[in-house]
A protein has these predicted regions:
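Conserved alpha-helix/loop element of class I SAM-dependent methyltransferases that forms part
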Residues: 37-54
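A short glycine-rich, Lys/Arg-flanked "PGG" loop and its adjoining helix->strand segment in the class I
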Residues: 136-151
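Class I SAM-dependent methyltransferase SAM/SAH-binding core
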Residues: 65-111
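Conserved catalytic/acceptor-binding region of the Class I
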Residues: 149-211
């Protein structure tokens, strides 16, 4: 079964929920958007190139549509395991990676996987959606899964600058939560690094990119001309979907100076370090 037919045969998560009630990332997926990361495909690919995928045992938290899973497989890992809490998304990713990997339906805080089973753990646009307590639990689980010397690679939404006024940060978080129907809790780049360091990880690389998820240029760069045209067509024929996406776009535009996509690769120290 091809990747395309696999995707088509599996429903999107929240596909039965009204468009005004569904989480924003799944609304964008309903519109036809496949790359749902704040810094775009280029930032993800740069992050993966620094994670050391070749010959590695890789675990991905919250693979969602499975786009990054495909890119990980291109890197030649020894194994791939997705950990996805949503059963529909887990089934979708399982079909996409069939014969080359697997996807388990589990919580990233408690994966059920063996300690020290991974050389690389990847997670994108999922820590942002959690409270600081849950962020810490997920990062700790990633650290548990990693072998000494293993890498944890994350791509998340960051507040900017590091000394952002707290009132601005609060307004941004509230506006973002209203727009995407998820209680998003982005952190500054400095705070993201501190989340990783608190679990004993050592930050090796930090990369950033504009948070331009719905800008025309980014859409074409991430989805291609054909993909951008597909999204435009879907929005043109569904007014509720169009209204919801435009609300998100206005919010992203309003706060664009205070948001970034950030990718960080951190290493679990070896026992003799």
């Amino acid at each position: 079964m091809s990747d395309e037919s696999s995707e088509a045969s599996t429903p999107l998560p929240f596909s039965q929920r009204p468009v005004d009630k569904a989480p924003g990332h799944w609304v964008l997926a309903r519109a036809g958007k496949r790359v749902l990361r704040p810094g775009g495909a280029a930032l993800t690919r740069s992050m993966l190139s620094r994670a050391g995928l070749a010959g590695a045992d890789v675990v991905e938290f919250a693979p969602g549509l499975g786009v990054t899973a495909g890119w990980i497989l291109e890197g030649g890992p020894a194994s791939y395991t997705g950990v996805e809490q949503d059963p529909d998304a887990a089934a979708r990713v399982g079909r996409i990676v069939r014969g080359r990997g697997r996807c388990v339906n589990a919580d990233a805080r408690r994966t059920g996987l063996d300690s020290g089973c991974a050389d690389v753990v990847v997670g994108e646009a999922m820590l942002t959606m959690q409270s600081d307590r849950v962020k810490a639990e997920i990062v700790s689980e990633a650290a548990r899964l990693l072998r000494p010397g293993g890498r944890y690679a994350i791509h998340e939404l960051a507040l900017a600058p590091d000394d952002i006024d707290e009132a601005v940060a609060t307004d941004l978080r509230k506006a973002l939560a209203r727009a995407i129907n998820v209680n998003a809790r982005p952190s500054t780049v400095k705070a993201w690094k501190e989340h990783l360091e608190a679990a004993g990880l050592v930050v090796q690389h930090v990369g950033t990119a504009p948070m331009a998820l719905l800008s025309p240029g980014r859409v074409v760069a991430d989805e291609g001309v054909g993909g951008a045209a597909r999204i435009a067509w879907n929005l043109a024929r569904d007014k509720d979907l169009r209204a919801r996406v435009l609300t998100m776009r206005r919010t992203f535009k309003k706060y664009e100076k205070n948001m970034r996509g950030v990718a960080i690769v951190a290493r679990k120290p070896k026992e003799d370090e």
